[in-house]
Structures are given as structure tokens and as C-alpha cells.
């Protein structure tokens, strides 16, 4: 077991439906700690930078339109094996394939409007935290 950090986004569909508290309760109930949190309205350029690995995929434009339509909540969660734990709590990207009790099974509307995003590896967590929370990243690395 190792102490890890992950970026988590509570996406616009969940924010619009007042699910922030319910989703945070799941993470905190699993022993994860909130290290940073901010509500943000992101623009197209920022969204495209975050989702750059999906640029050539068919769903890219609809994903960018969705993620920029209204505010979202960005947070850094920390805990033992946080990346795998969070991904397990979130469930499969497609809510119909997600296990019962997971965040996406409970709250997601579709494969795109799936309520949450989380880093999928240590490398992506570092990259995403640096993008979303540059001051926190700088303080962690540079003291």
C-alpha cells in the first residue's frame, strides 16, 4: 500500500443535480482525504488540454461541449492506493456496465454525462494535478 493523490472532477451533470455532497460522502467514507477543492467554470482551450488524449476520438467535441457547459468541482484526493480505490468507487465509464453501488451506477446519466472523472495512473495524476492545481503541485514538488 502506498499513499497516493488523484485528481477527481465532479462533472457538470452532477453539479447541476446537486450531487456534490453525496459524491464527496462516498470518497470520504472510503477513507480518502480532500487535499484541495475548487469549483471552476473551464473554457474550451482548458478542456481540450485536459482531454488531449481523446482528440482524435469521435466523441471529443461532445465531451468538450459537455465539460464546459456549466461549473464543475475539481479536487485532489489522497489516500492509500487512492487511484485504484477511486476508480473502483467510481465504477465503469458506462453507467450501465458499472457495478451496483458505484458513483456512476447511482448518479451518471450516460457514458459522457457520467458524473465523475479520476486520474487513471500515477503519471496521469501528476499531469492532471499540475494542470488543475498548479500552485498545489508547485508547493508539493518545490516546497
Curated annotation (Swiss-Prot):
Its main location: cytoplasm. It is found in: Cytoplasm. The keyword Methyltransferase does not apply. GO terms for cellular component: cytoplasm. Its EC number is 2.7.4.6. Its cofactor is Mg(2+). It catalyses: a 2'-deoxyribonucleoside 5'-diphosphate + ATP = a 2'-deoxyribonucleoside 5'-triphosphate + ADP; a ribonucleoside 5'-diphosphate + ATP = a ribonucleoside 5'-triphosphate + ADP. It comes from the Bacteria. It is an enzyme of class 2 (transferase). Keywords: ATP-binding, Cytoplasm, Kinase, Magnesium, Metal-binding, Nucleotide metabolism, Nucleotide-binding, Phosphoprotein, Transferase. GO terms for biological process: CTP biosynthetic process; GTP biosynthetic process; UTP biosynthetic process. The keyword Phosphoprotein applies. It holds the Pfam family NDK. SUPFAM superfamilies: Nucleoside diphosphate kinase, NDK. Homotetramer. Major role in the synthesis of nucleoside triphosphates other than ATP. The ATP gamma phosphate is transferred to the NDP beta phosphate via a ping-pong mechanism, using a phosphorylated active-site intermediate. This is Nucleoside diphosphate kinase. The lineage of its organism: Bacteria, Bacillati, Bacillota, Clostridia, Eubacteriales.
Amino acid at each position: 500500500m502506498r499513499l497516493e493523490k488523484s485528481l477527481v472532477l465532479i462533472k457538470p451533470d452532477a453539479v447541476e443535480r446537486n450531487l456534490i455532497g453525496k459524491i464527496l460522502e462516498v470518497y470520504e467514507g472510503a477513507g480518502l482525504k480532500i487535499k484541495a477543492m475548487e469549483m471552476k467554470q473551464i473554457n474550451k482551450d482548458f478542456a481540450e488540454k485536459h482531454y488531449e488524449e481523446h482528440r482524435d476520438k469521435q466523441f471529443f467535441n461532445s465531451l468538450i461541449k459537455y465539460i464546459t457547459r456549466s461549473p464543475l468541482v475539481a479536487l485532489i484526493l489522497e489516500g492509500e492506493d487512492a487511484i485504484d480505490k477511486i476508480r473502483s468507487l467510481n465504477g465503469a465509464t458506462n453507467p450501465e456496465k458499472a457495478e451496483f453501488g458505484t458513483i456512476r451506477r447511482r448518479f451518471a446519466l450516460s457514458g459522457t454525462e457520467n458524473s465523475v472523472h479520476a486520474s487513471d495512473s500515477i503519471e496521469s495524476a501528476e499531469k492532471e494535478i499540475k494542470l488543475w492545481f498548479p500552485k498545489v503541485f508547485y508547493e508539493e514538488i518545490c516546497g
